[in-house]
Regions:
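N-terminal, polar/charged subdomain of small-to-medium soluble alpha/beta proteins
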Residues: 1-92, 97-100, 104-150
Length: 150
């Protein structure tokens, strides 16, 4: 499982011109799922995400997490996080899990993030062609892969 985290001033997801979800200051999280992913990946990344100290404290040091600043979280599925560009110029998405596997894992990930945050999170719509708008804050962008323990 891969997540791409962006600290935002605000973010929203629309589908076909209709607003689906919007948040104020917090985190926009894109999530890509592989067939081998499971509950351990969900719990590890959901917990890590909500504990990342990437918000400034009173001294301007990134020392606070999203919970401490009262931030919101928007979770959006994105299978292209598993793109392979090793061969040729057309990305391959063979590592991305099929919908039958990834949809329930995405839903469980969003629920797990909500549990770790202590409140419901905003989401995109799995499998939809979404328009995502955001205002980066910093910018702060962090990539975490559950298979790489860095």
């Amino acid at each position: 499982m891969r997540i791409l985290i962006q600290r935002v001033r605000r973010a929203s997801v629309s589908i076909g011109g209709t607003l689906k979800s919007a948040i104020g200051p917090g985190l926009l999280v894109f999530v890509g799922i592989e067939a081998e992913d499971g509950e351990e990946d969900i719990e590890r990344l959901a917990g890590k995400l909500t504990r990342l100290r990437i918000f400034d404290d009173e001294n301007g040091v990134m020392n606070l997490d999203v919970r401490q600043v009262g931030g919101e979280i928007l979770v959006v599925s994105q299978f292209t996080l598993h793109a392979s560009t090793r061969k040729g110029n057309r990305p391959s998405y063979i590592k991305a899990a099929p919908e039958a596997i990834s949809r329930p894992l995405y839903e469980r990930f969003a629920a797990g993030v909500g549990r770790a945050l202590g409140r419901e999170v905003a989401t995109g719509e799995f499998g939809a062609d979404m328009q995502v708008e955001l205002v980066n804050d910093g910018p702060v962008t962090i990539w975490i892969d559950s298979r790489q323990r860095e």
